[in-house]
Amino acid sequence: MSRKPFIAGNWKMNKNPEEAKAFVEAVASKLPSSDLVEAGIAAPAVDLTAVLAAAKGSNLKVAAQNCYFENSGAFTGETSPQVLKEIGTDYVVIGHSERRDYFHETDEDINKKAKAIFANGMLPIICCGESLETYEAGKAAEFVGAQVSAALAGLTAEQVASTVIAYEPIWAIGTGKSASQDDAQKMCKVVRDVVAADFGQEVADKVRVQYGGSVKPENVASYMACPDVDGALVGGASLEAESFLALLDFVK
């Protein structure tokens, strides 16, 4: 079945609201048709209202970079999924390796967040990926498979079918090293096979699997040519409007 490609830029902790607004204004009217490709930006929490206002009426989807699994309460410094939905957020990125690494997020946390995101009417972009050590030990498939299974545990088949899963080998994030086309295809297929084993092939055929890790305008088309790669989660190359638009050129 055909899955609509999804290119999402992850700005990480970059841009103030003014810069974010200028970026969205520069790209909003130049995006390809939403029939061809979905384009999104994951903005820092402090930029979300500016991004949402600037993106209004355009094809640009807006994602938060994280949220908590409770809607409100004594959770100082956390972001409410309920409020993210209320302001108009479409997606929430969860389980990014930087969150797992620096903030000690567990598979269980990520699973709770996925459930909270669905409960509030948004969609999760669930990140998974292995370290260089795990990759070199030949255990990438086993490790990533366990991450995916744990993140999706207890979700309905319908929820899983609309989930986006981003495979990002940690050794390729921001390092300038990117996985080969073969590696990306192999691991994105591992992700899909795990979904098939847990929820059935029909669901697995609907899940969109992104590749992330040093994706640039020059190499995005080669990844998008892989049968199991349905998009990309892009860091550095999504920070400039021109570069972000160039990432979407593969649809031409």
Curated annotation (Swiss-Prot):
An annotated GO cellular component: cytosol
Family recorded in the similarity comment: Belongs to the triosephosphate isomerase family.
Name by which UniProt lists this protein: Triosephosphate isomerase
EC top class named in words: isomerase
Keyword Zinc: no
Chief subcellular location: cytoplasm
PROSITE patterns (UniProt xref): TIM_1, TIM_2
Biological process terms in GO annotation: gluconeogenesis; glyceraldehyde-3-phosphate biosynthetic process; glycerol catabolic process; glycolytic process
Classification via SUPFAM superfamilies: Triosephosphate isomerase (TIM)
Catalytic function, reaction form: D-glyceraldehyde 3-phosphate = dihydroxyacetone phosphate
Compartments reported by the entry: Cytoplasm
Residues binding substrate: N10, W11, K12, G174, S214, G235, G236
